[in-house]
């Protein structure tokens, strides 16, 4: 289920638990938030408790940074090939939600097929006319590099965030 649907369900726990095993309710901080996995790229999976207010502040700080380099966050299209049950997949969606801008999830298999990826993205309704942002992990970036169609696609982004592990030297 999409995180946006879960976050809007009234009467449910204030904490959306996207990680396993679930954290007992008595251990959760006050206020709404997300329990999510982190650290998968380095092997040591851990659960993170992310209060919604912290996620909102992170999105606001990122918006401030984008504005400082001349990009209006509300005018962006954020593409996201990362799973929502990881911090790196949740944050692009969360930022888009806070900025009032579109978020386009990308199926992970598209990242392995550059021609299909380019076709898919060019068919997105917001592809033309919006500043494009992308989040990926080093493995995805390494797969795309050296492939002309993928490199041309990457060059169409104003910002590419790479996280989750160190970049190869």
What are these regions (language model features)?
Residues 1-26, 160:
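ANL superfamily adenylate-forming
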Residues 56, 85, 141-142:
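Nucleotide phosphate-binding site architecture
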Residues 38-41, 78, 93, 134, ...:
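Conserved S/T- and glycine-rich ATP-binding loop of Class I adenylate-forming
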Residues 108-116, 121, 127-169:
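Adenylate-forming
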Residues 20-37, 71-77:
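Conserved pre-ATP/AMP-binding loop-to-beta segment of ANL
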Residues 60-75, 85-130:
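Conserved AMP-binding/adenylation subdomain of ANL enzymes
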Residues 33-60:
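Conserved AMP-binding A3 loop
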């Amino acid at each position: 289920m999409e995180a946006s649907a879960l976050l809007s369900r009234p009467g449910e726990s204030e904490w959306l638990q996207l990680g396993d095993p679930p954290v007992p309710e008595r251990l959760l901080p006050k206020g709404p938030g997300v329990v999510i996995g982190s650290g998968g790229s380095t092997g040591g999976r851990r659960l993170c408790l992310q209060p919604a207010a912290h996620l909102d502040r992170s999105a606001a700080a990122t918006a401030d940074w984008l504005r400082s380099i001349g990009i209006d966050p509300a005018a962006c299209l954020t593409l996201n090939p990362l799973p929502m049950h990881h911090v790196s997949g949740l944050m692009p969606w969360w930022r888009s939600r806070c900025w009032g801008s579109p978020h386009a999830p990308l199926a992970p298999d598209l990242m392995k097929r550059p021609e299909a990826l380019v076709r898919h993205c060019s068919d997105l309704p917001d592809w033309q006319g919006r500043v494009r942002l992308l989040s990926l992990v080093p493995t995805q970036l390494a797969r795309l590099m050296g492939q002309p169609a993928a490199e041309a696609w990457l060059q169409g982004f104003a910002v590419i965030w790479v996280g989750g592990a160190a970049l190869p030297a």
